[in-house]
């Protein structure tokens, strides 16, 4: 009888430990997502470009979904350089045009077809570190203004970039096919 009680007691402790570890793991993931939200919204201010405006406010239905595919974008004219104009932006602040070409804020939501849904954490972190699309050095560089900002994001530690990734994977996917980056002649790279 004593032996059965001992075995039962050990089983209860073992199961309790497994549950506690599982809860701690969920809490740890929730903490990481919360940290990522803080970094995305308050520190890196990703929504400033990646969330289109609806008037003076952000269009939260398009939170981090990038430049709307059906929205017009600015077109840079090289004569503007003589007027010291080097960057044009759309009214939504999600498309940018300059001597480099035209770039569009990407869809950062986890949508599998139009966002980061097929990316891996490694691709995301490598992209921030290398300033190349999908973190692949054979891919094109990330264009301004994001290409300029990623040199700052590259200084973030791995824990912060992983937290940002965890948060981006946790938000609602939004289907929004962002236009490809255009070269100076208005053609996709």
Q: Where do the protein language model's features map onto the residues?
A:
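Glycine-rich, acidic and aromatic/proline-enriched surface loops and short helix-turn segments
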Residues: 126-134
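Second-shell loop/turn segments in exported
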Residues: 109-116, 149-154
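Electrostatic cytochrome c docking/interface patches
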Residues: 23-41, 54-56
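N-terminal Sec-pathway targeting helices
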Residues: 1-12
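Flexible coil segments in periplasmic/lumen-exposed cytochrome c-class electron-transfer proteins
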Residues: 51-103, 133-189
């Amino acid at each position: 009888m004593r032996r059965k009680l001992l075995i039962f007691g050990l089983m209860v402790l073992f199961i309790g430990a497994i549950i506690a570890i599982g809860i701690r793991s969920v809490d740890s993931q929730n903490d990481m997502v919360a940290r990522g939200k803080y970094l995305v919204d308050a520190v890196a201010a990703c929504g400033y470009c990646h969330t289109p405006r609806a008037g003076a406010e952000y269009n939260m239905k398009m939170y981090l979904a990038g430049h709307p595919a059906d929205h017009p974008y600015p077109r840079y004219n090289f004569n503007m350089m003589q007027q010291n104009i080097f960057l044009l932006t759309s009214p939504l602040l999600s498309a940018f045009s300059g001597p480099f070409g035209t770039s569009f804020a990407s869809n950062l939501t986890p949508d599998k077809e139009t966002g980061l849904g097929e990316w891996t954490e490694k691709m995301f972190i490598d992209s921030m570190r290398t300033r190349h699309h999908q973190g692949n050095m054979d891919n094109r560089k990330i264009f301004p203004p994001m290409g300029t900002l990623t040199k700052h994001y590259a200084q973030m530690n791995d824990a912060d970039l992983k937290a940002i990734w965890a948060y981006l994977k946790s938000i609602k996917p939004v289907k929004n096919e962002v236009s490809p980056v255009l070269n100076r002649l208005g053609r996709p790279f």
